[in-house]
Amino acid sequence: MKTIRLGTRPSALAMWQATWTRDALVKLGLDVEIVKITTTGDSKRHEAIVNLGAQGVFTKEIQGALLAGEIDLAVHSLKDLPVEKAPGLKLVASPKRADTRDVFVSNRYESIADLPPGARLGTSSMRRKSMALRYCRKRFPDEPAWDVRDIRGNVETRLKKLDDGEYDAIILASAGLTRLGFGDRARSFLDDSEFLTSVGQGALGFETREDDAETIEQVVKLRHEPTWLSVLAERALLRRLEGGCIAPIGARASVVSVEGAELISLNAEILTFDGAKDYRTQSLQVLRANANDRELPLETKEQLAELLGSNAAETLLDLGATGIVAEIQKSRAERAARLSAPPQK
């Protein structure tokens, strides 16, 4: 077996993910070399993600290295990986998912419910911003809204900005905070009923060249089937809504057992950018009706998971989310036009 060249971003969190992946593959008896690749998102740390334009600001250069044969395997934070398949590449597996929840981090307040009107709340996510504005509107209908500000940089940088007083609180992913050893900074978890998490949050994704059977054969050994089916459902939902990584869309799927039956459950919602309107849906897909039934082949389960996601998206559209999808697409087109316009003299 050849040495597997594993591509990753150079950030501390990405290196944690790559090191974990390398160690897991080494336990299978493989030789692995980590290759650091700087992406657009890394080189433009001070710009808001929504202003960087195209999808894949944290993945495009890594995928390019895969296609060029410079690496054999890429490890992504799955929430950063565009849902549209890249020609010549294949998403082949996800290991067991970490905590999917968002956390509230503050030096002054115990929970997001304690934030007063006008408080400065930092997040890099349009989804979190929309949900925070919705939550604030419900809590303080007659008071000034929170000042929800963009915050860029790695986890350590964001925590320093909080400690320096630039923000009263920030929202981060529990998985990243914990992986880097800062789990004790979380003051409380955000409830899924108000802050449904991002598609793929807490999960890693392994991507290879689709014709690299040798690498695929080894990497799929790291696949955690419940996680894999869950993220396939979530990504199918996002793909049908054409939302992209920055859209105010939340989704959380999980494989559950109920009285011997095996099911995939999916909660999903889409919001306007200002959080004033939202649509939600909950749905189930049966994988096995009872414990005595023959287990379905993985390929069939994958198809059912993706069908669940696309059907949930159709439900949201039927409920009235078409206008929000159009708003998202319009906003994306306007950003693309601004970025492609020649600089003014």
Regions found by a protein language model. Give the residues of each.
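Small-molecule-sensing regulatory modules
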Residues: 1-38, 43-44, 51, 134-345
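Short, small/hydrophobic-residue-rich motifs at membrane-helix boundaries and re-entrant hairpins
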Residues: 15, 19, 68, 77-78
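Short, structured active-site "lid" loops
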Residues: 46-73
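Paired acidic/hydrophobic, glycine-rich loop segments that form the ligand-binding mouth/hinge
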Residues: 55, 70-77, 168-173
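Alpha-helical segments flanking ligand/cofactor-binding loops in enzyme cores
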Residues: 64, 112-113, 159-160
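Extracytoplasmic loops/domains of multi-pass membrane proteins
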Residues: 65-67, 81, 309
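A conserved helix-loop-strand patch within extracytoplasmic ligand-binding domains
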Residues: 78-81, 87-145
